[in-house]
Amino acid sequence: MAEINLFEKYSYEEVKVNNVSLRPYINLSRRGIVPHAATTITKGTTGKARIPIAERFVCSLMRHGRNSGKKRLAINIFEDACFIIHSMTKKNPLQVLVDAIVNSGPREDTARIGRAGSMRRTSVDVSPLKRISIAISNLSAGIRNASFRNRITLAEAIANELIAASTNSQNSYAVNKKKEIERIAQSNR
């Protein structure tokens, strides 16, 4: 049987998740040529963990306003972004996506604790599934901010943000947001 590759170009076999705690939640086992599962795999408490990571990222691009619900458009834009990433870095775009998610997920956050009418914030650890969700949300927010009312295309914005986040660069919106969240959590210890 032939190997299934993303967009018939990028192999799932080469992708490694370097963070041990995130490895069970970054799903690379459900392989598809196109990041569209169209199944009921999201049932249960940890249903998001069974969705392929490329599809979760594509679905996050569809949110908020003009592009909501246009999954085919989001898949085509992600395919163009994968081509740009591969031509700029000579790396597998799936590996760049996984590294960007690992680097932009905060490890600590703050929670509000209230007793007797008084509220205070305290530092808490973030679960791996929540860490991935925050990372994907921050990546897509940075991409939206970079391409809104700008000459840069959405595919170029995706490529720039993912490359910057995968190298842990300060140019990435998601990495800066992660550092801000962790700094606030550290001050509330």
From Swiss-Prot:
GO annotation, biological process: translation
Subcellular location: Cytoplasm
GO CC, one annotated term: small ribosomal subunit
Single Gene Ontology MF annotation: structural constituent of ribosome
The keyword Transmembrane helix is annotated on this UniProt entry: no
Keyword vocabulary terms for this entry: Cytoplasm, Ribonucleoprotein, Ribosomal protein
InterPro entries: Ribosomal_uS7 (IPR000235), Ribosomal_uS7_dom (IPR023798), Ribosomal_uS7_dom_sf (IPR036823), Ribosomal_uS7_euk/arc (IPR005716)
Ribosomal protein as UniProt keyword: yes
Domain of life per record: Eukaryota
Signal peptide: none
Similarity comment: family membership: Belongs to the universal ribosomal protein uS7 family.
NCBIfam families (UniProt xref): uS7_euk_arch (TIGR01028)
Quaternary structure (record): Component of the small ribosomal subunit.
Protein name, per record: Small ribosomal subunit protein uS7
Record organism: Encephalitozoon cuniculi (strain GB-M1)
